C-alpha cells in the first residue's frame, strides 16, 4: 500500500514543480532541491533502517513514512491549488500495464531466487511480454491513453527513460550486493553496514545542487554526461579493487556522486521536452522505468 501511494505521489510532486516554475532556470534549481529530498532519505535510510531492524523489528521501518507524510500533507495544504482537467480512465491500458509490471517483477524476483528455468517463472515472463504487447495495442486504440505512445517518438524522452532505468540498475545493484557482503562476509551489523554507504550517500545532496548550477552554465547535458562518466569510473573501480573494505568504500564515492550529478538534469531535460500538461505522465514513466531497473538489479545480483 505504501508503495502504491509513493508511485502516485512521486510523479505528481514533479508535476507540481513543473507547474510552479515556468522559468527554466528557476525550475532547474527547484528540481535539484526536489532531488535533494530523495538523496537525504537515501543517506539516512540505510542507517535508520539498520537501527530499527536491529533494535526493534524490520516492521518498524514502515512507520518512518508517517511523520514525513504528515509534514508533507501540512505543507501541501498551503500550496496553490492545481488546475484540474477531467480525463477519462483508460481501463485497458491500466490493467495491461499492471499485469505486465506485476508479472515481470514476480518473474525476475522469483527467478533470481529459484532459477529462471522453472515453469512458473517462464510463465510469468511470457505473461509480461504478452501483457506489454497488449498494453501497446490498447494505447494505440484508446481515445485517452494512459501513456500516449507518441511520447516515445521524442528521442529525448526515450533516452531519459533509458538513463533512469540504467541508473537504478547500477545504484540498487551495488547497494544490494555490498549490503550482503558487509553483513554476511564481514559479519557487520545492519547499522554498521548502513554506515558504510554514508561516504557515498552523504555527497549526493551536494551533487544534486551542483547539477543545477552546472546545467545553468553549460547546459543540462553537461552534468548528465559528466555524472554518468564519473559513475562509470566508480563502478569500474568497484570491479577492479580488492575486497578490502576501505577500497570498496572509497570506490563508492564516485559511483554514487556521479549519479547524483546526472539524475536532476535528466529530469530537467525530460520535463523541458514535453508540454506542461503531460509532466505528471512523463514523470510517472521515468519513475516506472527506474523502479523496474531497481527490481531487475536486485533479482539479477541475488543469484
Question: Residue spans of the language-model regions?
Answer:
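Hydrophobic transmembrane-helix bundles of small-molecule transporters
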Residues: 32, 54-164, 170, 188-189, ...
Amino acid at each position: 500500500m505504501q508503495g502504491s501511494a509513493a508511485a502516485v505521489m512521486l510523479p505528481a510532486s514533479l508535476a507540481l514543480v513543473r507547474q510552479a516554475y515556468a522559468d527554466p532556470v528557476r525550475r532547474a534549481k527547484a528540481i535539484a532541491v526536489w532531488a535533494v529530498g530523495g538523496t537525504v532519505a537515501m543517506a539516512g535510510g540505510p542507517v535508520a533502517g539498520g537501527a530499527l531492524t536491529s533494535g526493534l523489528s524490520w516492521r518498524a521501518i514502515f512507520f518512518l513514512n508517517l511523520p514525513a507524510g504528515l509534514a508533507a500533507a501540512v505543507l501541501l495544504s498551503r500550496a496553490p491549488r492545481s488546475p484540474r482537467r477531467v480525463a477519462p480512465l483508460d481501463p485497458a491500458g491500466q490493467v495491461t500495464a499492471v499485469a505486465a509490471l506485476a508479472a515481470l517483477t514476480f518473474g525476475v524476483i522469483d527467478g533470481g531466487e529459484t532459477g529462471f528455468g522453472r515453469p512458473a517463472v517462464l510463465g510469468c515472463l511470457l505473461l509480461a511480454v504478452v501483457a506489454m504487447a497488449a498494453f501497446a495495442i490498447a494505447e494505440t486504440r484508446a481515445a485517452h491513453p494512459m501513456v500516449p505512445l507518441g511520447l516515445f517518438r521524442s528521442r529525448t524522452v526515450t533516452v531519459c527513460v533509458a538513463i533512469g532505468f540504467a541508473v537504478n540498475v547500477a545504484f540498487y545493484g551495488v547497494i544490494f550486493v555490498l549490503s550482503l557482503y558487509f553483513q554476511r562476509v564481514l559479519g557487520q551489523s545492519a547499522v554498521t553496514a548502513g554506515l558504510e554507504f554514508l561516504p557515498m550517500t552523504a555527497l549526493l545532496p551536494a551533487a544534486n545542487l551542483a547539477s543545477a548550477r552546472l546545467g545553468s552554465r553549460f547546459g543540462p547535458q553537461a552534468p548528465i554526461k559528466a555524472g554518468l562518466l564519473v559513475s562509470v569510473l566508480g563502478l569500474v573501480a568497484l570491479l577492479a579493487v580488492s575486497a578490502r573494505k576501505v577500497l570498496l568504500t572509497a570506490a563508492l564515492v564516485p559511483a554514487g556522486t556521479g549519479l547524483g550529478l546526472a539524475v536532476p538534469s535528466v529530469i530537467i531535460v525530460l520535463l523541458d521536452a514535453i508540454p506542461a500538461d503531460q509532466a505528471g505522465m512523463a514523470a510517472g514513466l521515468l519513475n516506472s522505468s527506474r523502479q523496474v531497473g531497481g527490481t531487475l538489479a536486485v533479482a539479477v545480483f541475488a543469484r
